[in-house]
Design a protein with these regions (language model features):
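Glycine-rich acetyl-CoA-binding "A-motif" of GNAT/NAT acetyltransferases
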Residues: 70-73, 145
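Conserved acyl-donor/pantetheine-binding loop and adjacent beta-alpha core of acyl/acetyltransferases
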Residues: 74-104, 164-171
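Conserved acetyl-CoA-binding loop-helix of GNAT-fold acetyltransferases
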Residues: 107, 113-126, 148-152
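Active-site rim helix/loop that mediates acceptor-substrate recognition in acyltransferases
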Residues: 39-67, 76, 82
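Conserved beta-strand-loop-alpha-helix junction that forms the acyl-donor binding cleft
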Residues: 112, 136-147, 163-174
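Conserved active-site tyrosine of GNAT-family acetyltransferases
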Residues: 31, 150, 155
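Conserved N-terminal entry element of GNAT/NAT acetyltransferase domains
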Residues: 1-29, 33, 187-188
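Helix-loop element at the rim of GNAT/NAT acetyltransferase active sites that forms part
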Residues: 28-44
Length: 188
C-alpha cells in the first residue's frame, strides 16, 4: 500500500474548543506517549499535561487523525503572538501578527512514518491560508525525523533557543530548539 492510499484510510477531523472536551483524555494520553517515551523522551508531569493542552486549545485550534477508532495523531496551532519564546526582535522579516505557530505535532509511535504528521501539517496550512502569510514551528534539534519532514515541506531554520526540560523528576537537561519558517502565501 502506497503512502497516498494509507493517508486516505486516515480520518482527519478539526480540533477546536467545542469538540476538544470529548477527546481530551485521548489527546492527553497521546501527548504523554509521544513526548515521554522513545528516543526523544523527556519527563512531563502527567498532572500538568492536561493544563498545557487546555491552554493550547483556548489559544488556537488543530486537527486529529484517527486510524480506525484509534487516535493516531494531533496537531495544534495558534497565532505566533502566543509564543513568548519566539525571538521576534532578531527576525523582523517574520510578521508575528500574520504568522501561524504550529505548537504541537504528535503521532503515536505505532503510526509514525505513515504520512500522518505531513497530512496534519498540510491541513493546518490549507486552513490558515486566508488568515496567515507565514508559519513557524519549533523542533528539538535531536528530532531528526521531524526536521527532515519539515525540510521536505519547505521549512528552513531561522533561529534557535535553549530550553530547560526534565529527563526525570528533579533531573533537568538543556534542549536546543530550532525555529523553522516558511511562507504560506505572499503578504497582501
Amino acid at each position: 500500500m502506497g503512502m497516498d492510499e494509507a493517508m486516505r484510510m486516515n480520518r482527519l477531523f478539526k480540533l477546536d474548543q467545542f469538540n476538544y472536551p470529548r477527546f481530551r483524555g485521548k489527546i492527553i494520553d497521546l501527548y504523554l506517549h509521544a513526548f515521554t517515551s522513545g528516543e526523544y523522551a523527556q519527563y512531563i508531569d502527567p498532572r500538568t499535561a492536561g493544563t498545557t493542552l487546555d491552554a493550547l486549545v483556548r489559544k488556537g485550534w488543530g486537527n486529529m487523525v484517527f486510524v480506525g477508532d484509534r487516535l493516531a495523531g494531533v496537531a495544534m496551532a495558534m497565532s505566533l503572538q502566543h509564543d513568548r519564546d519566539f525571538p521576534a526582535a532578531e527576525l523582523p522579516a517574520i510578521a508575528v501578527e500574520r504568522s501561524l505557530y504550529i505548537s504541537e505535532v504528535m503521532v503515536h509511535a505505532d503510526y509514525r512514518g505513515r504520512g500522518i504528521a505531513r497530512q496534519m501539517v498540510d491541513d493546518l496550512l490549507a486552513r490558515a491560508v486566508d488568515t496567515f502569510t507565514d508559519v513557524v514551528i519549533r523542533v528539538w534539534d535531536k528530532n531528526l525525523p521531524a526536521l527532515a519532514l519539515y525540510h521536505k515541506l519547505g521549512f528552513y531554520p531561522v533561529a534557535s533557543i535553549r530550553q530547560t526540560k526534565l529527563e526525570a523528576p528533579g533531573r533537568p537537561f538543556e534542549m536546543r530548539k530550532i525555529y523553522l519558517h516558511r511562507s504560506i502565501r505572499s503578504a497582501d
